[in-house]
Amino acid sequence: MKKLFLAITVTIFALCAHAQEYVEPVEKWKAAEVWGINYHGWSFHQDWEVDFTVESQDGRFTPTDEEIAETEGLIQKRIDYINQDHYNQEGMCPIIDEHMRMYRRQYVGFTNDRGDHIVWVNFLWDDNLSNEKLASDILLTKGGCGHFWHIKCNLATRKVYGLEVNESGDIQYLPRVKKPAPRISRSKDRNKKQKVRKTGIIHSPEEKLFK
């Protein structure tokens, strides 16, 4: 009888210990929301997977509020000159430099082989897009002309370059080709710190290179 009681006690203790170590996955990471003069957007963490690279890419970084403010200042100062050809902005399509306040942004940080910080900025003008959607993942699009565009800014050289404006046509939100964003796991013991399951970055020939 004592042996049976001891066996039951050991089993219960083992089950309790296992339950304490159980990690319960919860909601996805959300990008950090940022506001400034004439801009509103979301900064994505350096471990967030993306479907593209930049030239001479060597790594990733998370754009800070200060870096985003600097990026926006450079873009807003120079976009009028960079966009002087008004490519894909004919007819009913908006001239992008005349409507900068209308776009919500997504910011992704890259480093190149010289250690420069390059911020890729995605501009989206779609009143049907919720802020929740914009914070949940990076959105690549096709169509929509001047309502959707992206550009890069090298903070070391202060160069703004690589403007790409969507072609005309119905807007399409392109499916993601990579894994979901990193997820936060929370232990049932609320006194423990949250654990982050990092997915890392996959580089393959199929990744799109924005020049």
Sequence positions of predicted segments:
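Bacterial Sec-dependent N-terminal signal peptides
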Residues: 1-23
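Generic short amphipathic/hydrophobic targeting helices enriched at N-termini
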Residues: 6-8, 192, 198
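Compositionally biased non-globular segments, especially hydrophobic aliphatic-rich helices
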Residues: 10-17, 184, 199-202
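Surface-exposed acidic loop/strand-edge motifs in secreted or periplasmic proteins
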Residues: 22-133
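Extracytoplasmic electrostatic interaction patches
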Residues: 117-184, 188, 195-197, 201
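Short, solvent-exposed mixed-charge patches
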Residues: 209-211
